[in-house]
Amino acid sequence: MSDDQVLDCVIVGGGLAGLAAADRLRHRRVLVIEAADRVGGRIRSLPRGDYWLNLGAHMFGGPGTRIGDLAAELGLETRPIGRALIGMAMGGRRVFRGAVETFPFRLPLSVAARLSFIRMGLALRRGVAGAVHALGPRPGETAAEARARGLAWDNGATLAQRIGPLHPQIETILRAITERTGGDPAEMAAGYALRSFANVWSRHSPGCNLVGGSSLLPEALVRRIGDRILLGAEASAVEARDDVVTVACGSGSTARVVRARSAIVATPAFATKRIVRNLPPATAAALGAIRYGAFLSAAVLTDERSPMPWDRNYAISTPERAFSVVFDQASTLRGRGARAPGGSLMLFRGAKGAERLLQASDDQIASAFADDLAAEFPECRGRLREIVVQRWEAGAPFSFPGRAALQPALTMGLGPIFLAGDYLEFPNMEAAVATGWEAAEAVERRLVA
């Protein structure tokens, strides 16, 4: 593809939003520019025989969701998460089944801590009920309107403010179960956190796993997009002049300038602010105000020959450990027959806890996680075959009080440049695909005008 050619669209960023946009525009002359040596962004998995190691996003929507339908369209197999999403291991006690309302009475807590847990639970239940009522679909509402409404709901206070003072043990529990959303209770907006609880507090699984590992999705998109992806080419400038967008990327002998009639910038908010030239001041300020929380994950391949304590759970919270949650990535492979040997876990830490651990080396993190896993679950001692550490310094954009006020500046027209990414909505794979598709549709409308 010649640099003298004017493309229909250049897409900056090869994460899920960028790939989704490129896939929608694959009938056009497009080019995806990605700084890393692989696509997928925060989706990453590694095949390991009958299992796989998941290091990033792993919960897919089912049929009827954008991400679920896209996976099916690409011929990929997703399976419902048929295991409990709420379990806790704390103080030598395992509470893996039963209603969450019983946890205060089943965990080893003081009387004061039990009462604090109950107060927290009641506050969360009230908030979740409000979220379900307020965030339901409304007839005639556009996707952008629904997105803005979701961001604005209960956006004036943090989760910690909404719940009130807690016993120190319960503060630790709350931090552990909210870390996967990117922020701490004292940072994240109450509405954002309650929406996350609403997704999890269900008798039914909120999603599926992709059999074979999450990376199969971006890999399938790459096959369909074809050889129109440029890896290892970090964009340094995106600028619109006279209805032509120029993108400078690469450096030294690999430096090049790509020209196109339009551009979709699907990079994190802070990168978008850095590379897009001549942004309106309000948009630049809004992009700079988006906050990201760190994620740290360790994928663990195990070789056990007998059932393990996590077999009936998909997620187990571990408030007192170096990691805050254990995800059983092999759970969707467990049927009613004999249990196959081996397995795959993801050990996760997020927010401030992840930030602290990121100061250590990969070997130190792997050792700390392995020691704590064996301490919490002695059954796995000597059964850990491999540990792969993955650092996500910008793991997820989280909503904070006042975040909703930024949305108009983030969605205003920028001429031939369009923005996409999960920072525009509640951050998950569904949001990445939705914003990528919407940007692609806007490009298509511009091209045919």
Predicted regions and their residues:
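Glycine-rich FAD pyrophosphate-binding loop
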Residues: 26-48
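Mid-domain catalytic core of redox enzymes
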Residues: 4, 233-358, 375-376
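Hydrophobic/small residue at the entry helix of a nucleotide-binding pocket
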Residues: 16-17, 39, 435
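N-terminal Rossmann-like FAD-binding beta1-loop-alpha1 element of flavoenzymes
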Residues: 7-32
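Active-site/ligand-binding neighborhood in enzyme catalytic cores
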Residues: 130-245
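Conserved flavin/dinucleotide-binding core of flavoenzymes
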Residues: 4, 100, 310-312, 326-449
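Glycine-rich, N-terminal phosphate-binding loop of Rossmann-like dinucleotide-binding domains
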Residues: 64, 267-268, 422
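Dinucleotide-binding Rossmann-like beta1-alpha1 core, especially the glycine-rich loop
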Residues: 51-134, 148-149
